[in-house]
A protein has these predicted regions:
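PLP-dependent amino-acid enzyme catalytic core
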Residues: 1-321
Length: 321
């Protein structure tokens, strides 16, 4: 039996699961990449490990130094868990209207939590963190939105895993947040096969879908610009909050995958692509989409059991990305 040195060795190498029973096109195969199987519960485990370990190697993060990061959830949880294992104190800035489970998980992992006004969204938390970084130059501000260790983590792990397990992939679908997943995986897959299509899922301008942002809402992550995102993305698909919740419920009901709401958005985007793709006779398209995290952090939102109208209204009041 393989014995791992510690839990950090379990980050990555997540499974692909065939969910083609959801496909609207019999010639389009749907595969879900289960990032909820990472030890701290989300795709952000990858970038948290990458950012901390690279900061250690380049001398930006020293023993006992405080880490600071704005995050409304998954990145903060993963950073807090790894920081606790490695002995770093950590401060997480987050909007005051995130789901209660996220605050609870940060507390479990020993993070200091500073809340920012929910009306300012995640952008407000980022601005506050930038100001605090200037006031506390001895802290290590990792800044996932501009840290190249974010897309590098996906270029070095997520992309190669997908290619290893499914070299016949024709489309890759993921949500737009920091854009790290799309940049890293997209660059890797296109280097392997220039014809692979990279599709971003985003909410409508001014609307919230857990884990996602619209690039036209006024903030373009520096990671997207540094990695020439417009050359990597082939198209974007808009997914509304209601569609995200409906598809999140389908994942549970029809596939037994208990996932977060942004995973439902990824599925909704994949279904749109599956409906549009032109598959040659006797051919097949293979769409891989990201299941970003598990559903346990969203139970208090009622996304899985409440009336759909009620769940949609509740989700729109909560900041997730």
């Amino acid at each position: 039996m393989l014995v791992n040195e510690n839990v950090l060795d379990l980050i990555g190498n997540t499974p692909l699961v065939d969910v083609s029973n959801l496909s609207p096109n019999p010639r389009v195969r749907l595969l879900a990449k289960l990032e909820n199987q990472n030890p701290f519960g989300s795709v952000k485990d990858r970038i948290a490990k990458s950012m901390i370990e690279r900061a250690e190697k380049n001398g930006k993060l020293l023993p006992g130094q405080r880490i600071m990061e704005p995050s409304s959830g998954n990145t903060g949880i993963a950073l807090a868990a790894i920081a606790q294992i490695k002995g770093y104190p950590i401060t997480i800035l987050m909007p005051d209207n995130v789901s209660i489970e996220r605050r609870q998980m940060l507390a479990v992992f020993g993070a200091e939590i500073i809340v920012t006004p929910g009306a300012e969204g995640s952008n407000g938390a980022v601005k506050r963190a930038e100001a605090m970084a200037l006031q506390n130059p001895d802290w290590c501000f990792l800044h996932q939105y501009e840290n190249e260790s974010n897309p590098i983590a996906h270029y070095e792990t997520t992309g190669p895993e997908i290619w290893r397990d499914c070299p016949e992939v024709t489309h890759f679908v993921a949500g737009l947040g920091t854009t790290g997943t799309l940049m890293g995986v997209g660059k890797y897959l296109k280097e392997k096969n220039k014809d692979v299509k990279i599709i971003a899922v985003e909410p409508p301008i001014g609307e919230r879908v857990e884990g996602l942002r619209n690039l036209d809402d006024g903030y373009i992550p520096p990671v997207f610009e540094k990695w020439h995102g417009r050359n990597i993305l082939d198209r974007k698909r808009v997914v509304r909050p209601r569609e995200s919740i409906e598809c999140t419920r389908r994942l549970v009901r029809e596939c037994g995958i208990f996932a977060g709401i942004s995973s439902g958005a990824s599925l909704a985007g994949a279904l749109k692509v599956a409906s549009e793709v032109d598959v040659a006779e006797n051919g097949q398209a293979v769409i891989v989409f990201i299941v970003c995290d598990g559903g346990w952090k969203y139970l208090s939102t009622g996304a899985y059991t409440d009336d759909l109208d009620v769940a949609e209204a509740a989700a729109e009041k909560i900041i997730y990305f």
